[in-house]
């Protein structure tokens, strides 16, 4: 008998050729940074730096399934979902969000992982006609040389990016609202489930530290 594996899928939009999926990759901040609630790159007890995020998976079955499927991934911050919901509640006509990230250790060629994500809405197409599927999500995966910025961050070194895979999915207003709304509600439920214990643990440690300092 196969094990009943726990799936981290939150919401999915699927046609006979395309798939868009949001997945749970949320992580708690260390107790020392309890008020962040979501991990934001703080150093964990094991020495690693974790980031709380929602995974984005796009798949293209146009050329067949199995090894013919094109699959790309990216990550979004938890704050993106309430943000886009608030925009949608204001009779949104256009929306334009783009983000690119480079991360991970370089390979033998000095290249690191790159994700490029674009989420746009245009109610009218270039031909002037109203679009039935106004939302377009594009994810691109590739490799590039990671370069440090003067502020201490990293970015893609100019001229080094190599695209590996790209998938786009067009979505109508109702389906896009549904997957974003369900994800926003999940994030809220996650915060209400795990946040209280994190806050209690942090306040107890803080009280213990204050008591020890007064002795």
What are these regions (language model features)?
Residues 1-68:
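N-terminal "first-domain core" detector
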Residues 45-50, 74-78, 129-130, 168-177:
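Short, low-complexity cationic-aromatic patches
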Residues 53, 73, 134:
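Beta-strand-rich binding-surface signature
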Residues 58-77, 154-169:
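A cross-kingdom feature marking solvent-exposed beta-strand/loop segments within repeated
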Residues 61-63, 81, 144:
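Conserved beta-strand elements of beta-rich interaction domains across eukaryotes
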Residues 90, 105-164:
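Short, solvent-exposed interaction modules
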Residues 144-215:
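Mixed-charge, glycine-accented linear interaction segment located at domain edges/termini
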């Amino acid at each position: 008998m196969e094990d009943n594996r726990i799936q981290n899928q939150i919401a999915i939009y699927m046609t006979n050729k395309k798939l868009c999926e949001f997945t749970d990759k949320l992580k708690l901040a260390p107790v020392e940074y309890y008020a962040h609630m979501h991990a934001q790159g703080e150093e964990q007890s094991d020495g690693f730096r974790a980031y709380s995020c929602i995974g984005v998976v796009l798949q293209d079955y146009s050329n067949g399934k199995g090894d013919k499927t094109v699959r790309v991934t990216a990550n979004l911050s938890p704050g993106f979902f309430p943000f886009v919901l608030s925009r949608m509640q204001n009779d949104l006509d256009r929306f334009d969000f783009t983000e690119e990230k480079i991360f991970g250790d370089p390979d033998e060629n000095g290249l690191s992982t790159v994700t490029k994500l674009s989420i746009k809405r245009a109610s009218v197409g270039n031909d002037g006609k109203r679009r039935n599927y106004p939302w377009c999500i594009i994810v691109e995966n590739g490799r590039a040389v990671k370069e440090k910025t003067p502020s201490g961050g990293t970015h893609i070194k100019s001229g080094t990016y190599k695209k590996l895979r790209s998938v786009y999915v067009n979505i109508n207003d109702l389906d896009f609202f549904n997957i974003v709304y369900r994800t926003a509600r999940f994030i809220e439920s996650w915060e209400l489930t795990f946040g209280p214990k994190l806050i209690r643990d942090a306040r107890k440690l803080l009280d213990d530290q204050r008591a020890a300092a007064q002795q």
